[in-house]
Amino acid sequence: MKAKKVLSGALAAILLTLTPGVAVCAEEMAGQEQTENTQVLSAQEQENQEKAASYAEKIDTNEISNWPQGPAIYAASGIVMDMNSGAVLYAKKAEEKRYPASITKVLSVLTALQYAKMSDTVVFSEDSISFLQWDDAQIGMKPGEEISMESALYGMLLASANEVSYAVAENVGKQYLNGGYAEFIEEMNRISQELGCTSSNWVNANGLHDDNHYTTAHDMARIAAAAYQNEEFRRLETTLEYKVPPTNLTAEERILDQNHKMLWPENYYYYANAKAGKTGYTDQSKTTLVTMAEGNDMQLAAVVLHTYGVDAYTDTRFMYDYAFTNFERLNLRECETSSDIESQISELR
């Protein structure tokens, strides 16, 4: 070992004496590596600080008198809403506008289901492929390739395929809306508004970042509720694996797996009450998640926006544990007499 150290020292001396350019280059590389490490640490520190600050922010529903106190979460916005009544059981900054990322596809699929049949053919145009970046979620479709609408919707919900989302929007727009992709986006906005979404704007069908593409946790819960009431949507979203049959341009099957970890029984983040959901992520939106669950005779939608990685699952679990512990659906006719109701009315007076 000593011989190696001496040799290394001698070599360094020669480099410094005879080839200063090389020595300087080595120093610059070492400095660059140190700077890069510092930047990585700074990014991690910034994330940790943001998470800590968000975790410390108040929960809006905790401010309601006599309301059960809900848990702190890392997400910037979160909500649990009863999908049948619209009652909000838990809310943290649920009305603030944020980027949804791929949970946009819940609305895209809901829009397509208003018109399309599962047997419809979806044809992939050059436009539906050409915008893709190397790291975008996709299933490798080719221009001119054809799949069924059913396979396409599975591609959107299970694999979060961005080119498939574009192609579905384009094909539904052409076949049913007397237009194309733009008309489908208009219909997404119309349906969103019809559902009571007052703070959302949609400019694409896949959720890739655009400054003008945004929603709120509350609006997203409304959309999730409407989607979950659709039988076809539930069938698609509760599927864990689907095989896209061979196509006119691809001889092999494409195997699609559900991305939502809370739906897989063998996964660490599995949640027995969870029935359906959609994941999302962009650099700007950070992690987003929508989850539909059932329990205590309730159907609930949970949404978290702008959180980090698996925090989306732990946040959702905490919110659902809180909701199922503190709330249940009751039949007022069975629980109250007329005198109870009259007494409550007199108190309100």
Task: Locate each region found by the language model.
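Domain-terminus/edge residues, biased toward the C-terminal soluble/receptor-binding domains
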Residues: 197-198, 211-349
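Sec-dependent N-terminal signal peptides of Gram-positive bacterial secreted proteins and lipoproteins
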Residues: 2-25
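Residues in and immediately flanking transmembrane alpha helices
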Residues: 17-18, 118, 331-334
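Hydrophobic alpha-helical segments, especially transmembrane helices
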Residues: 3-6, 106, 295
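Active-site-adjacent loops and short helices of periplasmic peptidoglycan-processing enzymes
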Residues: 25-218, 227-231
